[in-house]
């Protein structure tokens, strides 16, 4: 699963997920991409599950780029523990997703195969998505 090798701080505050994706919103590496249209948090497990679904569908053809990385730790206190006594321990890692963020990119397969692979991947993700192609200027 994806997670940072080391971080400056072990735990972070919750924060707010507002605004639109300023960076990473265009197809940069492949020819077709899966772009988020909604906002939310994607866990490392969900990123991996979507990657596996795509990889199984394209069957060794083409290349996949993962454009998101889970760099935010989410903490959780154990069950039946009273409030207080500090922040809980880190349970999993998430990537915060804003509308417009490119999640995955692909090349080397036909467009209909790529669209079907992205459809399978989108079913594993908690944010709404759309398929976009690279615009040639």
Curated annotation (Swiss-Prot):
Highest rank taxon of the organism: Bacteria
GO CC aspect terms: cytosolic large ribosomal subunit
Gene3D superfamilies associated with the record: Ribosomal protein L10e/L16 (3.90.1170.10)
Alphabetical list of InterPro entries matching this protein: Ribosomal_uL16 (IPR047873), Ribosomal_uL16_bact-type (IPR000114), Ribosomal_uL16_CS (IPR020798), Ribosomal_uL16_dom (IPR016180), Ribosomal_uL16_sf (IPR036920)
Molecular function terms from GO: rRNA binding; structural constituent of ribosome; tRNA binding
Keywords: Ribonucleoprotein, Ribosomal protein, RNA-binding, rRNA-binding, tRNA-binding
Record flagged with keyword Lyase: no
Listed Pfam families: Ribosomal_L16
Signal peptide start-end: none
Keyword tRNA-binding: yes
GO biological process: translation
Function: Binds 23S rRNA and is also seen to make contacts with the A and possibly P site tRNAs.
Homology family: Belongs to the universal ribosomal protein uL16 family.
NCBIfam families: rplP_bact (TIGR01164)
Subunit structure: Part of the 50S ribosomal subunit.
PANTHER family xrefs: 50S/60S RIBOSOMAL PROTEIN L16, LARGE RIBOSOMAL SUBUNIT PROTEIN UL16M
Protein name per its UniProtKB record: Large ribosomal subunit protein uL16
Name of the coding gene: rplP
